[in-house]
């Protein structure tokens, strides 16, 4: 589990194209016009996911199952879909009607396993998500059109259009690619503008050294124009928080479903949201193991209701920041501490 600033996925965007002649609308028109019902196959419940579950938990479980596949078989094993990948696919398909984010992940795992799934299935997932301004899917289309993938030939114009759109919608890797690509084309004003967006001092200085005063003025002007087109930082943060809550919910449910016993989906969301927000409050609270241990101990302290702020308890705090303890050891020692207090 990583802090939200390190998540790979920067997923929440706003529609910027307002008329048929806008660049965004032209990009949308280059994609198949398919509904969600047309692209989502029918799937059955599995041992982890059912259609009755809420989408937040379904998304989190899908991601956790993908991680489990990597642990069991290695990240490079993509020729065949494992049992875990097949279950993850079903979970993510169930989540898709409310979580367009899941389509980015679906496109990735399906597109990498072409012995089991059609290339068109993967492309349609990515295309639908990109039309709905998911920056992860827009970046995916840049990758597809850059080299030619999923039965689509290389197309430099489309590739660069999707790259620039993903960058505007907050995908940091795409923003870095805009700096690199613009610099390679000697388009230093554009490179400078994107370096300013990234707010990386070394990158800004590296580009500035290659620029004339006139180019600097053009770069500042382009940067000012970009500011009005970028997805607001607060919206990106809210979306990342939402994704991290889903990820943490699925992770906890997969490994320790007892954490959520007796909770409604709304109560579970509030419980996990508190854990996620503590990642920002306490710098030493940042590992997956800490989150799992925290959730388990919190339920020991208070069986119902919101998560308790264990960081205010010196003895429990000391346990949680002890890197030498496993989750199981941390919880066992916490039980001992709590039992002594009841005597």
Regions found by a protein language model. Give the residues of each.
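Terminal, low-structured helical/coil segments at or just beyond the last alpha-helical repeat
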Residues: 203-244, 331-339
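C-terminal motif of bacterial Sec signal peptides marking the signal peptidase cleavage site
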Residues: 16-17
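TPR/TPR-like (Sel1-like) alpha-helical repeat modules
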Residues: 161, 165, 186-203, 223-228
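Short helix-capping/linker turns of helical repeat alpha-solenoids
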Residues: 46, 51-54, 58, 65-68, ...
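A contiguous, surface-oriented mixed alpha/beta subdomain in the mid-to-C-terminal portion of proteins
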Residues: 230-310
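Structural signature of tandem alpha-helical TPR/SEL1-like repeats
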Residues: 80-90, 115-125, 152-162, 187-190
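Short coil/turn linking the two alpha-helices of tandem helical-hairpin repeats
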Residues: 67-77, 107, 111-116, 142-153, ...
